[in-house]
Amino acid sequence: MLKIGSHVSMSGKKMLLAASEEAVSYGATTFMIYTGAPQNTRRKPIEELNIEAGRKHMELNGIEEIIVHAPYIINLGNTTKPETFQLGVDFLRMEIERTSALGVAKQIVLHPGAHVGAGADAGIQQIIKGLNEVLTPEQTVNIALETMAGKGTECGRSFEEIAKIIDGVKYNEKLSVCFDTCHTHDAGYDLVNDFDGVLNEFDKIVGINRLQVLHINDSKNVRGAGKDRHENIGFGHIGYKALHHIVHHPQLTHVPKILETPYVGEDKKDKKPPYKLEIEMLKNGTFDEGILEKIKAQ
Protein backbone atom coordinates (compact mmCIF):
# COMPACT_ATOMS: atom_id res chain seq x y z
CA MET A 1 0.00 0.00 0.00
CA LEU A 2 1.21 3.47 -0.92
CA LYS A 3 1.61 5.50 2.28
CA ILE A 4 0.65 9.00 1.15
CA GLY A 5 -1.04 11.92 2.85
CA SER A 6 -0.56 15.57 3.74
CA HIS A 7 -0.27 18.01 6.56
CA VAL A 8 -3.68 18.22 8.26
CA SER A 9 -4.99 20.31 11.14
CA MET A 10 -5.49 18.98 14.66
CA SER A 11 -7.85 21.54 16.15
CA GLY A 12 -11.13 22.32 17.91
CA LYS A 13 -12.53 19.81 20.38
CA LYS A 14 -12.10 16.83 18.03
CA MET A 15 -8.30 17.24 17.73
CA LEU A 16 -6.80 13.89 16.54
CA LEU A 17 -10.23 12.76 15.30
CA ALA A 18 -10.55 15.97 13.24
CA ALA A 19 -7.09 15.38 11.75
CA SER A 20 -7.96 11.80 10.80
CA GLU A 21 -11.31 12.84 9.28
CA GLU A 22 -9.60 15.51 7.17
CA ALA A 23 -6.96 13.03 5.98
CA VAL A 24 -9.57 10.42 5.04
CA SER A 25 -11.50 13.05 3.06
CA TYR A 26 -8.36 13.44 0.91
CA GLY A 27 -8.05 9.69 0.28
CA ALA A 28 -4.90 9.63 2.43
CA THR A 29 -3.30 6.55 4.02
CA THR A 30 -1.14 8.57 6.44
CA PHE A 31 -0.95 12.19 7.59
CA MET A 32 1.19 14.74 9.43
CA ILE A 33 0.19 16.98 12.33
CA TYR A 34 1.60 19.56 14.70
CA THR A 35 0.54 18.85 18.30
CA GLY A 36 -0.20 22.59 18.63
CA ALA A 37 0.51 25.83 16.76
CA PRO A 38 3.90 25.56 14.99
CA GLN A 39 4.89 29.14 15.83
CA ASN A 40 4.17 29.32 19.58
CA THR A 41 4.43 27.29 22.79
CA ARG A 42 0.71 27.07 23.62
CA ARG A 43 -0.29 23.43 23.88
CA LYS A 44 -3.49 21.66 24.95
CA PRO A 45 -2.91 19.02 27.63
CA ILE A 46 -2.49 15.44 26.36
CA GLU A 47 -5.91 14.51 27.85
CA GLU A 48 -7.60 16.97 25.46
CA LEU A 49 -6.08 15.58 22.25
CA ASN A 50 -9.00 13.12 21.83
CA ILE A 51 -6.53 10.33 21.16
CA GLU A 52 -8.82 7.32 21.60
CA ALA A 53 -11.50 8.53 19.18
CA GLY A 54 -8.84 9.62 16.69
CA ARG A 55 -7.09 6.26 16.79
CA LYS A 56 -10.38 4.39 16.39
CA HIS A 57 -11.21 6.46 13.29
CA MET A 58 -7.73 5.84 11.88
CA GLU A 59 -8.08 2.10 12.44
CA LEU A 60 -11.47 1.99 10.70
CA ASN A 61 -9.93 3.76 7.70
CA GLY A 62 -6.71 1.76 7.43
CA ILE A 63 -4.35 4.47 8.69
CA GLU A 64 -1.65 2.82 10.78
CA GLU A 65 1.07 5.42 11.11
CA ILE A 66 1.23 9.21 11.22
CA ILE A 67 3.99 11.81 11.42
CA VAL A 68 4.39 14.67 13.92
CA HIS A 69 6.19 17.88 12.98
CA ALA A 70 8.04 19.76 15.72
CA PRO A 71 7.26 23.50 15.95
CA TYR A 72 9.39 26.00 14.02
CA ILE A 73 10.28 27.92 17.17
CA ILE A 74 12.69 25.17 18.23
CA ASN A 75 16.22 26.23 17.26
CA LEU A 76 18.87 23.94 18.69
CA GLY A 77 21.50 25.66 16.52
CA ASN A 78 21.40 28.96 18.40
CA THR A 79 24.76 29.67 20.07
CA THR A 80 24.11 33.34 20.85
CA LYS A 81 20.97 33.17 23.02
CA PRO A 82 21.12 30.48 25.73
CA GLU A 83 17.41 31.02 26.48
CA THR A 84 16.44 30.21 22.86
CA PHE A 85 18.56 27.06 22.91
CA GLN A 86 17.10 25.99 26.28
CA LEU A 87 13.53 26.62 25.08
CA GLY A 88 14.29 24.33 22.13
CA VAL A 89 15.63 21.56 24.37
CA ASP A 90 12.71 21.75 26.83
CA PHE A 91 10.09 22.02 24.11
CA LEU A 92 11.47 19.11 22.10
CA ARG A 93 11.38 16.94 25.23
CA MET A 94 7.72 17.87 25.65
CA GLU A 95 6.95 17.09 22.00
CA ILE A 96 8.52 13.62 22.41
CA GLU A 97 6.24 13.01 25.40
CA ARG A 98 3.14 14.22 23.50
CA THR A 99 4.01 12.17 20.42
CA SER A 100 4.57 9.04 22.53
CA ALA A 101 1.12 9.56 24.06
CA LEU A 102 -0.49 9.52 20.60
CA GLY A 103 0.80 5.96 20.17
CA VAL A 104 0.52 6.07 16.35
CA ALA A 105 3.53 8.21 15.42
CA LYS A 106 7.11 6.96 15.34
CA GLN A 107 8.75 10.06 13.83
CA ILE A 108 8.94 13.72 14.89
CA VAL A 109 10.20 15.83 11.99
CA LEU A 110 12.60 18.54 13.16
CA HIS A 111 14.27 21.39 11.29
CA PRO A 112 17.81 20.84 12.66
CA GLY A 113 18.42 24.51 13.45
CA ALA A 114 20.00 27.75 12.25
CA HIS A 115 23.42 28.98 13.34
CA VAL A 116 22.27 32.66 13.30
CA GLY A 117 25.66 33.90 12.12
CA ALA A 118 28.05 31.78 14.22
CA GLY A 119 28.90 29.58 11.21
CA ALA A 120 27.72 26.10 10.20
CA ASP A 121 30.29 24.22 12.30
CA ALA A 122 29.32 26.05 15.50
CA GLY A 123 25.62 25.55 14.70
CA ILE A 124 26.09 21.83 14.09
CA GLN A 125 27.99 21.41 17.38
CA GLN A 126 25.17 23.22 19.19
CA ILE A 127 22.52 21.01 17.54
CA ILE A 128 24.52 17.93 18.63
CA LYS A 129 24.67 19.33 22.18
CA GLY A 130 20.90 19.91 22.18
CA LEU A 131 20.06 16.45 20.84
CA ASN A 132 22.39 14.88 23.40
CA GLU A 133 20.44 16.68 26.13
CA VAL A 134 17.08 15.56 24.73
CA LEU A 135 17.47 11.97 23.50
CA THR A 136 17.21 9.02 25.87
CA PRO A 137 17.68 5.28 25.22
CA GLU A 138 14.13 4.65 26.52
CA GLN A 139 12.22 6.89 24.11
CA THR A 140 9.98 5.14 21.58
CA VAL A 141 9.84 7.88 18.94
CA ASN A 142 12.62 9.07 16.65
CA ILE A 143 13.64 12.60 15.74
CA ALA A 144 13.65 12.84 11.93
CA LEU A 145 16.12 15.56 10.92
CA GLU A 146 14.76 17.38 7.89
CA THR A 147 16.95 18.08 4.85
CA MET A 148 17.01 21.87 4.51
CA ALA A 149 17.18 24.22 1.51
CA GLY A 150 20.06 26.32 2.82
CA LYS A 151 17.98 29.47 3.33
CA GLY A 152 19.62 32.02 5.63
CA THR A 153 21.79 30.27 8.23
CA GLU A 154 20.02 26.88 8.17
CA CYS A 155 22.07 23.82 9.09
CA GLY A 156 21.31 20.52 7.38
CA ARG A 157 21.55 21.87 3.83
CA SER A 158 23.69 18.92 2.69
CA PHE A 159 23.76 15.19 3.40
CA GLU A 160 27.23 15.75 4.90
CA GLU A 161 25.83 18.23 7.45
CA ILE A 162 23.02 15.82 8.39
CA ALA A 163 25.57 12.99 8.76
CA LYS A 164 27.82 15.20 10.91
CA ILE A 165 24.93 15.85 13.32
CA ILE A 166 24.02 12.15 13.49
CA ASP A 167 27.64 11.10 14.06
CA GLY A 168 27.98 13.48 17.01
CA VAL A 169 24.89 12.27 18.87
CA LYS A 170 25.27 9.58 21.53
CA TYR A 171 21.90 7.84 21.15
CA ASN A 172 21.81 8.32 17.39
CA GLU A 173 19.72 5.19 16.88
CA LYS A 174 16.90 7.58 17.87
CA LEU A 175 17.66 9.78 14.83
CA SER A 176 16.22 9.37 11.34
CA VAL A 177 15.87 11.70 8.34
CA CYS A 178 12.96 13.45 6.64
CA PHE A 179 13.89 13.98 2.98
CA ASP A 180 12.11 17.08 1.63
CA THR A 181 12.06 17.17 -2.18
CA CYS A 182 11.72 20.97 -2.44
CA HIS A 183 14.50 21.57 0.09
CA THR A 184 16.99 19.12 -1.45
CA HIS A 185 16.29 20.52 -4.94
CA ASP A 186 16.73 24.08 -3.66
CA ALA A 187 19.96 22.98 -1.92
CA GLY A 188 21.34 21.87 -5.31
CA TYR A 189 20.62 18.14 -5.62
CA ASP A 190 19.42 16.98 -9.07
CA LEU A 191 16.15 15.16 -8.34
CA VAL A 192 14.87 15.73 -11.87
CA ASN A 193 17.53 13.96 -13.93
CA ASP A 194 19.25 11.75 -11.38
CA PHE A 195 17.14 10.90 -8.33
CA ASP A 196 18.66 7.42 -8.16
CA GLY A 197 22.12 9.01 -8.05
CA VAL A 198 20.98 11.37 -5.28
CA LEU A 199 19.53 8.44 -3.32
CA ASN A 200 22.79 6.49 -3.71
CA GLU A 201 24.72 9.51 -2.47
CA PHE A 202 22.37 9.77 0.52
CA ASP A 203 22.89 6.06 1.20
CA LYS A 204 26.69 6.41 1.14
CA ILE A 205 26.79 9.50 3.36
CA VAL A 206 23.84 9.02 5.75
CA GLY A 207 22.46 5.52 5.14
CA ILE A 208 19.18 4.84 3.34
CA ASN A 209 17.84 2.97 6.39
CA ARG A 210 17.61 6.36 8.18
CA LEU A 211 15.26 7.80 5.52
CA GLN A 212 11.94 7.41 7.35
CA VAL A 213 9.81 10.33 6.09
CA LEU A 214 9.42 12.02 2.70
CA HIS A 215 8.02 15.52 2.24
CA ILE A 216 6.73 15.65 -1.33
CA ASN A 217 6.72 19.22 -2.63
CA ASP A 218 7.43 20.86 -5.96
CA SER A 219 9.63 23.98 -5.92
CA LYS A 220 9.01 27.53 -7.14
CA ASN A 221 12.76 27.95 -7.61
CA VAL A 222 15.52 26.66 -9.84
CA ARG A 223 17.84 23.98 -8.51
CA GLY A 224 20.40 25.34 -6.05
CA ALA A 225 18.46 28.57 -5.34
CA GLY A 226 18.59 28.00 -1.57
CA LYS A 227 15.13 29.57 -1.19
CA ASP A 228 12.61 26.96 0.11
CA ARG A 229 9.34 27.93 -1.57
CA HIS A 230 6.94 25.06 -2.10
CA GLU A 231 4.85 24.75 -5.28
CA ASN A 232 1.91 22.54 -6.25
CA ILE A 233 2.76 19.15 -7.76
CA GLY A 234 3.78 19.51 -11.41
CA PHE A 235 3.83 23.32 -11.46
CA GLY A 236 7.38 23.90 -10.24
CA HIS A 237 10.97 23.23 -11.24
CA ILE A 238 10.95 19.58 -10.10
CA GLY A 239 7.84 18.60 -12.05
CA TYR A 240 5.28 15.82 -11.93
CA LYS A 241 7.36 13.10 -13.58
CA ALA A 242 10.24 13.30 -11.08
CA LEU A 243 7.90 13.53 -8.07
CA HIS A 244 5.80 10.58 -9.29
CA HIS A 245 9.04 8.59 -9.68
CA ILE A 246 10.06 9.42 -6.09
CA VAL A 247 6.62 8.59 -4.64
CA HIS A 248 6.62 5.16 -6.32
CA HIS A 249 10.34 4.44 -5.88
CA PRO A 250 10.84 0.73 -5.04
CA GLN A 251 13.42 1.49 -2.33
CA LEU A 252 11.01 3.86 -0.56
CA THR A 253 7.73 1.92 -0.54
CA HIS A 254 7.64 1.71 3.28
CA VAL A 255 8.29 5.44 3.76
CA PRO A 256 5.31 7.75 4.49
CA LYS A 257 5.03 10.49 1.84
CA ILE A 258 3.63 13.79 3.10
CA LEU A 259 2.46 16.65 0.85
CA GLU A 260 3.03 20.22 2.09
CA THR A 261 2.00 21.96 -1.13
CA PRO A 262 0.29 25.39 -1.00
CA TYR A 263 -3.46 25.94 -0.81
CA VAL A 264 -4.90 27.18 -4.12
CA GLY A 265 -6.87 30.35 -4.96
CA GLU A 266 -6.52 34.12 -5.39
CA ASP A 267 -8.74 35.03 -2.43
CA LYS A 268 -6.62 34.66 0.70
CA LYS A 269 -9.73 33.92 2.78
CA ASP A 270 -10.99 31.20 0.46
CA LYS A 271 -7.98 29.11 -0.56
CA LYS A 272 -8.66 25.42 -1.13
CA PRO A 273 -6.53 22.47 0.00
CA PRO A 274 -4.99 20.69 -3.02
CA TYR A 275 -4.36 17.37 -1.31
CA LYS A 276 -7.30 15.20 -2.43
CA LEU A 277 -6.64 15.85 -6.12
CA GLU A 278 -2.84 15.86 -5.83
CA ILE A 279 -2.88 12.49 -4.02
CA GLU A 280 -5.21 11.10 -6.70
CA MET A 281 -2.92 12.42 -9.45
CA LEU A 282 0.21 10.94 -7.85
CA LYS A 283 -1.57 7.59 -7.50
CA ASN A 284 -2.89 7.38 -11.06
CA GLY A 285 0.32 8.26 -12.91
CA THR A 286 -1.02 11.03 -15.17
CA PHE A 287 -0.35 14.76 -14.79
CA ASP A 288 -3.53 16.86 -14.98
CA GLU A 289 -2.79 20.34 -16.33
CA GLY A 290 -6.22 21.55 -15.23
CA ILE A 291 -5.88 20.41 -11.62
CA LEU A 292 -5.55 23.91 -10.12
CA GLU A 293 -8.92 24.97 -11.57
CA LYS A 294 -10.47 21.75 -10.25
CA ILE A 295 -9.02 22.43 -6.79
CA LYS A 296 -10.50 25.96 -6.81
CA ALA A 297 -13.89 24.55 -7.81
CA GLN A 298 -14.02 22.10 -4.86
Curated annotation (Swiss-Prot):
EC top class, as a word: hydrolase
Gene3D superfamilies (alphabetical): Divalent-metal-dependent TIM barrel enzymes
Residues reported in the UniProt entry to bind Zn(2+) 3: 183, 228, 230
Pfam families in the cross-refs: AP_endonuc_2
Cofactor binding mode and count: Binds 3 Zn(2+) ions.
Species of the source: Bacillus mycoides (strain KBAB4)
Job description of the protein: Endonuclease IV plays a role in DNA repair. It cleaves phosphodiester bonds at apurinic or apyrimidinic (AP) sites, generating a 3'-hydroxyl group and a 5'-terminal sugar phosphate.
Its EC number(s): 3.1.21.2
Family listed: Belongs to the AP endonuclease 2 family.
Binding site for Zn(2+) 2: 146, 180, 215, 260
Official protein name in the record: Probable endonuclease 4
GO biological process per UniProt: base-excision repair
PROSITE patterns: AP_NUCLEASE_F2_1, AP_NUCLEASE_F2_2, AP_NUCLEASE_F2_3, AP_NUCLEASE_F2_4
SMART domains documented for this protein: AP2Ec
Cofactor list: Zn(2+)
